[in-house]
């Protein structure tokens, strides 16, 4: 067995290098190609440049706050009103079920 340089990383040891070069493909076979491909592609560990972060909002500006999404209640209220009107038509204004023959307060015409 040949002596191995202790300062050399393990993927550069003799016999540990794969026959094919590394590529940019992220398929399962290429992710397990070698130790370096596994850490970069399989685990997503990269010691390259970090992405630039957005600067933090200055605390001195009171108007600069995180936007809060508005609640859209107008549409819900319209739907509720329509449903209440529909229920009122079906039951009558007193809340009792409408009997077509004996209904005097409902706008229904008997025979419909």
UniProtKB/Swiss-Prot annotation:
Which residues are recorded with the post-translational modification N6-acetyllysine? Answer: 28, 50-51
**Sequence motif: Nuclear localization signal, RNA-binding (TAR), and protein transduction, positions:** 49-56
List all Polar residues biased stretches.
93-112
Instruction: Write out the ranges of the annotated region (Disordered).
Output: 45-112
Q: What Gene3D superfamilies does the entry give?
A: Tat domain (4.10.20.10)
Q: For this UniProt record, give its keywords in alphabetical order, as a comma-separated list.
A: Acetylation, Activator, AIDS, Apoptosis, Host cytoplasm, Host nucleus, Host-virus interaction, Inhibition of host innate immune response by virus, Inhibition of host interferon signaling pathway by virus, Interferon antiviral system evasion, Isopeptide bond, Metal-binding, Methylation, Modulation of host chromatin by virus, Modulation of host PP1 activity by virus, Phosphoprotein, RNA-binding, Secreted, Transcription, Transcription regulation, Ubl conjugation, Viral immunoevasion, Zinc
Q: Report residue spans for region: Core.
A: 38-48
| GO terms for biological process, alphabetical | DNA-templated transcription; positive regulation of transcription elongation by RNA polymerase II; positive regulation of viral transcription; symbiont-mediated perturbation of host chromatin organization; symbiont-mediated suppression of host innate immune response; symbiont-mediated suppression of host translation initiation; symbiont-mediated suppression of host type I interferon-mediated signaling pathway
In the record's own words, the domains note is: The cell attachment site mediates the interaction with ITGAV/ITGB3 and ITGA5/ITGB1 integrins, leading to vascular cell migration and invasion. This interaction also provides endothelial cells with the adhesion signal they require to grow in response to mitogens. The Cys-rich region may bind 2 zinc ions. This region is involved in binding to KAT5.
GO MF annotation, one? RNA-binding transcription regulator activity
Site, Essential for Tat translocation through the endosomal membrane: residue positions = 11
GO CC annotation terms, alphabetical? extracellular region; host cell cytoplasm; host cell nucleolus
Residues modified to Asymmetric dimethylarginine? 52-53
Matching HAMAP family, A to Z? HIV_TAT
Keyword Heme present in the record's keywords: the answer is no
The identity of this protein, by name, is Protein Tat
Q: Where is this region: Transactivation?
A: 1-48
Question: Lineage of this protein's species?
Answer: Viruses, Riboviria, Pararnavirae, Artverviricota, Revtraviricetes
Interaction with human CREBBP: annotated segments: 1-24
Additional information: HIV-1 lineages are divided in three main groups, M (for Major), O (for Outlier), and N (for New, or Non-M, Non-O). The vast majority of strains found worldwide belong to the group M. Group O seems to be endemic to and largely confined to Cameroon and neighboring countries in West Central Africa, where these viruses represent a small minority of HIV-1 strains. The group N is represented by a limited number of isolates from Cameroonian persons. The group M is further subdivided in 9 clades or subtypes (A to D, F to H, J and K).
Share the record's PTM remark. Asymmetrical arginine methylation by host PRMT6 seems to diminish the transactivation capacity of Tat and affects the interaction with host CCNT1.
Role of this protein: Transcriptional activator that increases RNA Pol II processivity, thereby increasing the level of full-length viral transcripts. Recognizes a hairpin structure at the 5'-LTR of the nascent viral mRNAs referred to as the transactivation responsive RNA element (TAR) and recruits the cyclin T1-CDK9 complex (P-TEFb complex) that will in turn hyperphosphorylate the RNA polymerase II to allow efficient elongation. The CDK9 component of P-TEFb and other Tat-activated kinases hyperphosphorylate the C-terminus of RNA Pol II that becomes stabilized and much more processive.
What are the Basic and acidic residues biased-composition ranges? Answer: 63-91
Which residue stretches belong to region Interaction with the host capping enzyme RNGTT?
A: 49-82
The subunit structure is: Interacts with host CCNT1. Associates with the P-TEFb complex composed at least of Tat, P-TEFb (CDK9 and CCNT1), TAR RNA, RNA Pol II. Recruits the HATs CREBBP, TAF1/TFIID, EP300, PCAF and GCN5L2. Interacts with host KAT5/Tip60; this interaction targets the latter to degradation. Interacts with the host deacetylase SIRT1. Interacts with host capping enzyme RNGTT; this interaction stimulates RNGTT. Binds to host KDR, and to the host integrins ITGAV/ITGB3 and ITGA5/ITGB1. Interacts with host KPNB1/importin beta-1 without previous binding to KPNA1/importin alpha-1. Interacts with EIF2AK2.
Note whether rRNA-binding occurs among the keywords. Answer: no
